[in-house]
A protein has these predicted regions:
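A short beta-sheet element
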Residues: 34-35, 54-115, 243-244, 257-323, ...
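Residues on a specific face of well-ordered alpha-helices
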Residues: 6, 108, 112, 116-117, ...
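Short coil/turn segments at secondary-structure boundaries
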Residues: 21-28, 47, 125-127, 197-199, ...
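Sequence-specific dsDNA recognition surfaces
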Residues: 5-24, 36-67, 213-232, 240-275, ...
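Specificity-determining recognition surfaces
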Residues: 116-145, 322-349
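Non-catalytic DNA-recognition/assembly elements of restriction-modification systems
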Residues: 1-18, 142-191, 195-226, 350, ...
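Short edge beta-strand segments in beta-sheet-rich domains
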Residues: 28-30, 90-93, 130, 138-140, ...
Length: 399
């Protein structure tokens, strides 16, 4: 097999980046995608803010994103990569744009290479900036890209795409299960159509026997901390260390980007929070919630929540999500950029009877366990793909 290495700007039609300006946020319009909306090979514009049509068109005069282009985060968290599989209608800011001339093969090959350990290592070793790491446009254009004959490249892409298709199908099943769990919570505790609701009187706005609290009255609210980053040994362990960068919207978190040692844990203000702890991000990406699937530590930009009156974390998790959505609505287009301990004084937690809670936990636990199983399967598929990827792309394993 004959291989060559060429520059990214030779491989691509062009290599560009998104706007460096900060267009004004609008209530409706077009999404402005940044690096934080690219994660695990997917582009998720749902959390991006909207900009006007005028700003959208202005950005796209030089940075139009089209099908089979490749996007990559280039500032802050560098190297999150995704190929554009659909016909997008968003603009980009501070994101690398590799134009692939509408070629599915070129787009997928490049995306797979940029996700490989070779490419990630190259980019990691060439980042600039002290407080915030970045890759310059000049560096992006000069990235080395290995190429082979088109037939071989297609075979490699086809093999890796099988894994991606399985991962994508798995993610769709997870989403359906998440929606089922959310519907169950809404039906029982928002619409109040819980078992036995027909014969349960409403007293002071809630079903008889239910109790109303402020979150802070009934929930333990615990903060985290960060070991000194200059002490290398603190970050040479296997304890997952949760930060807002790990908040991808998943119901459960199994692992984190950063890990710390037991010595690092002993030298920071974080506890070692047990499995089942509910986490909410307080700064950065604010209001993202998750449930720890394994014990973890966390930094000071999050809160850990625990309620001893509840049988499991699931009712607390869904109730917290509902209240965070309400807080975002109350912001009414304003900036919802931080949660402090006093925030929990202003949000409510209604606790049903133990009988209703026990039945809910029994039903929803079955759904949540299926979600965890599917998430583990997705992780194993991704790990298998990632082990295979460099061997296929280097020619170590031929297809």
């Amino acid at each position: 097999m004959s291989w060559a290495t060429i520059r990214a700007d030779e491989y691509c039609e062009s290599v560009r980046d998104g706007t460096h300006d900060t267009p004004k946020q609008t209530e409706t319009g077009y999404k402005l995608v940044t690096g934080k909306h690219i994660k695990n090979g997917q582009i998720d514009p749902s959390e991006a803010y909207c900009i006007s049509e005028k700003d959208y068109k202005k950005i796209n005069e030089r940075s139009l994103v089209e099908q089979w282009d490749v996007l990559m985060s280039m500032i802050g968290t560098v190297g999150e990569v995704a190929v554009v599989k659909d016909h997008p209608n968003y603009a980009i800011k501070n994101v690398a744009l590799f134009k692939c001339a509408g070629s599915e093969l070129k787009g997928k090959w490049l995306a797979y290479y940029l996700q490989s350990s070779d490419a990630q290592g190259h980019m990691s070793g060439n980042q600039k900036g002290s407080s915030q790491q970045f890759l310059s446009l000049k560096q992006l254009r000069s990235l080395p890209v290995p190429v082979a004959d088109e037939a071989y490249m297609q075979k490699v892409v086809d093999v890796l795409s099988v894994y991606d298709d399985l991962i994508e199908n798995n993610q769709k099943q997870i989403k359906l299960l998440e929606e089922a769990a959310q519907r169950l919570y809404k039906e029982w505790f928002v619409d109040l159509r819980f078992p036995g609701h027909e014969t349960t009187p409403i007293v002071d706005g809630v079903p008889e026997g239910w109790k109303k609290y402020k979150f802070s009255e009934i929930t333990s609210i615990m903060s985290g901390g960060t070991p000194k980053t200059e002490v290398k040994e603190y970050y040479e362990g296997d304890i997952p260390f949760y930060t807002p960068k790990d908040s991808d919207g998943s119901f459960f978190t199994f692992d984190t980007i950063t890990h710390i040692s037991e010595d690092g844990l002993a030298h920071c203000n974080s506890q070692y929070f047990p499995e089942g702890t509910v986490i909410i991000t307080a700064r950065g990406t604010v209001g993202k919630t998750t449930i720890l699937a394994v014990p973890m530590a966390m930094n000071q930009s999050c809160y850990a929540l625990k309620c001893d009156e509840l049988n499991s974390p699931y009712y607390l998790f869904f109730s917290l999500n509902k209240e965070v959505d309400a807080l975002k609505t109350m912001a009414n287009g304003g900036v919802f950029n931080t949660i402090i301990v006093k925030t929990f004084d202003s949000i409510n937690l209604t606790v049903p009877t133990q009988e209703v809670l026990s039945v809910f936990d029994a039903v929803v636990s079955s759904i949540m366990e299926q979600i965890k199983t599917k998430m583990r399967q997705k992780t194993h598929l991704a790990e298998a793909r990632d082990r295979l990827l460099p061997k296929l792309m280097s020619g170590e394993i031929e297809v």
